[in-house]
Each structure stands twice: as structure tokens, then as C-alpha cells.
UniProtKB/Swiss-Prot annotation:
Residues 117-127 have a biased composition (Basic and acidic residues). It comes from Mus musculus. The modification Phosphoserine is found at S476, S569, S570. GO terms for biological process: DNA recombination; homologous chromosome pairing at meiosis; meiotic DNA double-strand break formation; oogenesis; regulation of homologous chromosome segregation; spermatogenesis. Detected in spermatocytes and testis (at protein level). Required for DNA double-strand breaks (DSBs) formation in unsynapsed regions during meiotic recombination. Probably acts by forming a complex with MEI4 and REC114, which activates DSBs formation in unsynapsed regions, an essential step to ensure completion of synapsis. Not required for HORMAD1 functions in pairing-independent synaptonemal complex formation, ATR recruitment to unsynapsed axes, meiotic silencing of unsynapsed chromatin (MSUC) or meiotic surveillance. Keywords: Chromosome, Coiled coil, Differentiation, DNA recombination, Meiosis, Oogenesis, Phosphoprotein, Spermatogenesis. This is Interactor of HORMAD1 protein 1. Disruption phenotype: Mice develop normally without obvious somatic defects but males and females are sterile due to defects in homologous synapsis. Oocytes are depleted in six-week-old females and spermatocytes in males undergo apoptosis at a stage equivalent to wild-type mid-pachytene. Complete synapsis is never observed and incomplete synaptonemal complexes are detected in meiocytes equivalent to late-zygotene and pachytene. Residues 272-284 have a biased composition (Low complexity). Residues 372-381 have a biased composition (Polar residues). Part of the MCD recombinosome complex, at least composed of IHO1, REC114 and MEI4. Interacts with REC114. Interacts with MEI4. Interacts with HORMAD1. Interacts with ANKRD31. The gene is Iho1. Residues 113-133, 267-324, 372-393, 426-457 are annotated as: Disordered.
Length: 574
């Protein structure tokens, strides 16, 4: 809606009697009393200088007339109608540009003064409002600044506390990280060390296990060898027990009793009271060799000790014995040694060719020592002459035949030995034993004695031949149960063999005692030595085999245990 039209309608709606209630200033300034408001307004368009004076009064009158409208306009912040009307261009004249169009005969100075006043008032109002706004803003500005300062301070405090807490937390986190890293490093180092030590221990355990395994394997092989050895030893022990079971102990004891019950024959004697060197009796030294649990459980050797001085015409023959286990004869063979007479004069030996036939008596039981330990006392009581023990010619011939059958390849050697023994016995036949007597000559020996000696020498030669044949036979007594159970030892070399005849009233010289003193041998070994017996049993088990059953005495000589020899009755001071 156009403001100008609105203003016209408003002006037309104003009652006519309103001019009476105008203020006094209106009356004072009124040039024409008969003009109404519309006329005035209309005239102001043409005469602006007149309307300027009436403008404040019109404003006041308008406010009084329309209080509600003014209030509404104030609420709406709208300017008054007069201000609007004046602000609008002139109704007829308009702007200065259009002054030529509607030029009215109005004074120009008055119209310009009214507009200037209006503009100044308007400017003043705007300046006042601006100043009030600025004043209010400026008055609030310190408070805002104070608030900003307080807020900034609070923010700084908060930031400082926050930063301090953050720094503290960061420091604690860093320390925690450092401690954790150090602990982890220590743990890793310890774990690496433990791992290295464990690996070293595992290597050591592996080496130890390998060594133990090697030892176990070696032990297993040793156990297998021991088992095999135990089986072999068991077999050998069984064979040994079988061989021992073949021995007849009662028969052996009977043969020993027969041997000890044979009467002893007196030697070749001559009456002489001037005998300087008494003849030494055949002293049997029973020695027990090392006990070998072989085919012959125990071996006893009877030997004669060597003479101390050859000039004293000491007798040095050997003794030998044969044990025949055959069921036919059952006779214990005995051989008597040949004797030779003494040369008249200074007592030197003339017959130097008679060899020692054998060295040892070989027995098969330990009980032989109990019987033979009593023999020296029997011969000492018998005393005078050479003890010669013989056996029947029939038993000797049977023995020789058995030896020849067992060892046919050694037959010529046995015969050769027998011939040599016969020849030596024949040479001894015609030589009488002579002894010097003080101041008297001895009578020649009777031929009867010589015949007896010849017969004894023949039997002795045959027995010695049997011993030699048995020595060279490779078969063992266990393999040939019909053969004699003996072990032949190597005979000594030929020595001076003489026969000393003990005179009834002759005195023993100091040299004879010295010769007898040399008969004692001190190399003896206790029969109760259990440790030596255990070693001997081990040696026997190692030497025992089915192919070679030779008696251990033939392979390895043992230490002999000597018994006390028998002496002459005149040797009481020995």
C-alpha cells in the first residue's frame, strides 16, 4: 500500500472538531485559523517552510489523538506518520529533479530548513542510539575482559595441572617401560644361559649314555662269553667227575696195604769194623706236588736227596713206582734199584756208569702220604743195608705187554732202554762192595748174595724199561684204563751210584752227617692253601680238554712238600 495514499486516508478520517483541541503553540504559530489539518498537510506540500514550524505540534497532537497507535508503532519501532510523510517525496512537487514539473509558488528557503531539521533530528537520534549502544558495549567490555582473564587463568591452571599430570604419567610410564625392559632383558639372558647349560648338560648326558651303552654292550658280550665258558666248564667238570667215578678207592687202598706188607730184603753186607762212611739208607722223601683236579687227584713223589760230597761214596739212586689200575693184575709194581759195592781203599766210587732210572714215586690218592710217612721209621728200624723191593716176574711181564700194546710206536725205544739197563746191571754184577777195615782185610762176598742181587737187578731193569715206555706213550691214563696210572718225569743224568753197606759196629763220620744234612729240601708248600688250590683249579679248567688229557704234572711242575727223611740209627745227633 502506498504510504501517500495511506496518509491521505488517515488525514481524511480525522474528525473536524479536532482543531479546537490543538495546543497553544499551534495557535501561536498558526497563520491561518481556518485551515484544517488536511489543509495544512496539503499546504505543506507546497509550503514546506510553514510545515516545519507545525511539525512538532503535529507530532504531539498525533500522539495525543492516537495513543494506541503510537504505542503500537513504538512497539513495532516504526516512525511516526509525519516522519514517514516527510521522508517521502513530495506529493506534487517531488524531488528537486522534478521541480520543473510541478513548480509551485512556495518559498524555497523554508522548505529546505524543515528538511534539514528533520535530517538533523534523525541523525541525532541515530547517533544517540549508536552512542548508547557503544556506551553499553564499552561498559560491558571490562567485565568481558575480566571474565576472559579469569577464564584464561583457569584454563592455564587446568592446562598446567593437566600437563603436570601428563608429565608425571609419562615419567611413570617411561620408568615402568625401563624396568620392564630391564627385567625382560635379564630374563632373556638367564633363559639363554639356562638353555646353554641345559644343552651342555644334554651333551654330557648323551656322551655318558653312549659310554654306558658301550659298556653295556661290552658287558653283554662278556656275559655271553662267560655263559659259554660256564657251559664248557660244566662239561669239563662233568667229564672230570666221570673220570673220578672210575677210580676204585678201596682197590687202591688194598694195593697200598699189599705194598707196605711186602717183607723187606736185607742188603749186601760185609763184616767190617773199620767202615769210615756209613751207607745211607734209601730215604723216601714224599713230596706233594700242586694239587691239580685232573685225572690224577694227587701225586706223591719219592726221591732220594743228592749226596753232599762225592768222595764219601754217598749213594744217589732214584726210586720209581708204578700204579696199575687194570682189573686183571691189580698189583702195585715195585722196582728195586741196583746196588754197587764199595771199592776197597780210600772209599772212592769206581762204578760211575749206573744211571738213575727214575726220580719220583707217583701216587694217585692223598692217603698214600699217611702210609708212606711211616716207611722211614720202618726202614730206620730195619737199618742195615739197601732196601730193595721187588715184584713177581709174571706181573712185570704183563705190565710190559700192556705198555707195548698201548704204545707200539715206542716199542724199540723201550727195548733199547731195557737193553741198556740190562747191560748196566750186568756190569754191576761182578763188582763186590768193599770197605776198609782198620788193620784187617775184608773177606770176599759170597756168591749167594751176588745171585740175589743179579735177580733184583734184572727185575729193576724191566721195571725201568716199563717206566720209560710209559713216559714216551702219548696216551693218558684216563684214555687207556687198562694201562698203568703213572706220570713219568725226566730222569736225571748218569751219576755216581754206589751201594753203602752199613756195618754193625762202624762209626759214622762227619762227612756222612754232612751228606745226610743235604737231604733236607726246604721248598715246601702248605697243602691247606685254599687260594693256591683255587688258582690250580682255574689252571686245570683252562688246560682240560677232550683231545689232550695229559696229566698236569707232565706239563708243569709244582712246588713239592717234603717229609722228614729216614736216617741211620747212628745219626742221632743230626
Amino acid at each position: 500500500m502506498n504510504f501517500n495514499v495511506w496518509n491521505v486516508k488517515e488525514m481524511l478520517s480525522i474528525p473536524s472538531g479536532s482543531g479546537i483541541t490543538k495546543p497553544s503553540n499551534w495557535n501561536n504559530n498558526q497563520t491561518d485559523c481556518s485551515l484544517s489539518d488536511s489543509q495544512f498537510l496539503f499546504g505543506s506540500q507546497f509550503c514546506p517552510e510553514n510545515s516545519e514550524t507545525l511539525l512538532p505540534s503535529l507530532d504531539a497532537g498525533a500522539c495525543l489523538r492516537h495513543p494506541k497507535q503510537t504505542q503500537q508503532n513504538s512497539v513495532d519501532s516504526e516512525p511516526s506518520i509525519f516522519i514517514k510523510y516527510q521522508a517521502k517525496p513530495q506529493l506534487l512537487g517531488g524531488d528537486t529533479k522534478d521541480e520543473s514539473l510541478f513548480s509551485l509558488p512556495l518559498p524555497v528557503g523554508k522548505s529546505k530548513g524543515l528538511s534539514k531539521q528533520f535530517e538533523e533530528k534523525k541523525r541525532r537520534a541515530t547517533d544517540q542510539s549508536d552512542s548508547e549502544t557503544l556506551h553499553s558495549f564499552v561498559s560491558h567490555f571490562p567485565e568481558v575482559i575480566n571474565k576472559l582473564q579469569t577464564s584464561v587463568e583457569k584454563t592455564e591452571e587446568n592446562l598446567s595441572s593437566r600437563s603436570q599430570s601428563i608429565l608425571d604419567s609419562v615419567e611413570t610410564i617411561a620408568k615402568t617401560f625401563q624396568e620392564t625392559a630391564r627385567v625382560q632383558h635379564d630374563l632373556m639372558v638367564e633363559s639363554v644361559r639356562d638353555k646353554g647349560s641345559m644343552e651342555q648338560a644334554i651333551l654330557e648326558i648323551q656322551r655318558t649314555c653312549a659310554a654306558r651303552q658301550a659298556e653295556f654292550m661290552e658287558m653283554k658280550s662278556t656275559l655271553k662269553n662267560l655263559e659259554v665258558l660256564v657251559v664248557e666248564q660244566t662239561k669239563n667238570l662233568q667229564q672230570f667227575c666221570d673220570n673220578l667215578s672210575q677210580l676204585i678207592v678201596p682197590g687202591i687202598l688194598e694195593e697200598l696195604k699189599k705194598f707196605t706188607s711186602v717183607p723187606q730184603v736185607a742188603g749186601h753186607l760185609k763184616d767190617s769194623t773199620s767202615q769210615t762212611s756209613p751207607s745211607l739208607t734209601q730215604s723216601l722223601h714224599f713230596t706233594r706236588q700242586e694239587k691239580h683236579p685232573s685225572e690224577e687227584p694227587a701225586t706223591w713223589q719219592a726221591q732220594e736227596a743228592p749226596a753232599g760230597n762225592p768222595s764219601t761214596s754217598s749213594q744217589r739212586p732214584g726210586e720209581c713206582g708204578v700204579w696199575d689200575e687194570g682189573a686183571e693184575s691189580g698189583v702195585f709194581q715195585k722196582a728195586a734199584l741196583p746196588t754197587d759195592g764199595l771199592h776197597r781203599g780210600d772209599g772212592h766210587v769206581k762204578n760211575k756208569t749206573v744211571p738213575t732210572y727214575c726220580k719220583n714215586w707217583v701216587m694217585t690218592t692223598r692217603s698214600v702220604s699217611n702210609h708212606f710217612s711211616n716207611l722211614p721209621s720202618q726202614r730206620a728200624g730195619n737199618g742195615q743195608g739197601l732196601m730193595a723191593q721187588g715184584a713177581s716176574q709174571r706181573d712185570v711181564s704183563k705190565f710190559e705187554a700192556r705198555v707195548k700194546n698201548a704204545c707200539p710206536e715206542y716199542g724199540p725205544q723201550s727195548m733199547c732202554s731195557f737193553d741198556s739197563l740190562e747191560q748196566s746191571a750186568t756190569e754191576q754184577k761182578g763188582r763186590p762192595c768193599r770197605k776198609r777195615r782198620r788193620g784187617k782185610k775184608q773177606q770176599p762176598q759170597r756168591s749167594k748174595r751176588g745171585g740175589l742181587l743179579d735177580r733184583k737187578q734184572g727185575q729193576t731193569s724191566k721195571a725201568a724199561c716199563a717206566f720209560i715206555a710209559r713216559h714216551h706213550c702219548p696216551q693218558s691214563p684216563v684214555c687207556d684204563p687198562q694201562g698203568p696210572l703213572i706220570c713219568w718225569l725226566t730222569p736225571r743224568s748218569s751219576t755216581k751210584s754206589t751201594c753203602h753197606i752199613l756195618g754193625g759196629t762202624g762209626e759214622t763220620s762227619q762227612t756222612a752227617r754232612a751228606a745226610q744234612g743235604n737231604l733236607v729240601q726246604h721248598s715246601q708248600r702248605s697243602s691247606t692253601d685254599s687260594s693256591s688250590q683255587g688258582d690250580q683249579q682255574i689252571n686245570w679248567f683252562s688246560d682240560l680238554s677232550l683231545e689232550n688229557l695229559e696229566p698236569p704234572q707232565c706239563k708243569k711242575g709244582g712246588t713239592n712238600l717234603l717229609c722228614d727223611p729216614d736216617f741211620d740209627s747212628s745219626d742221632d745227633n743230626f
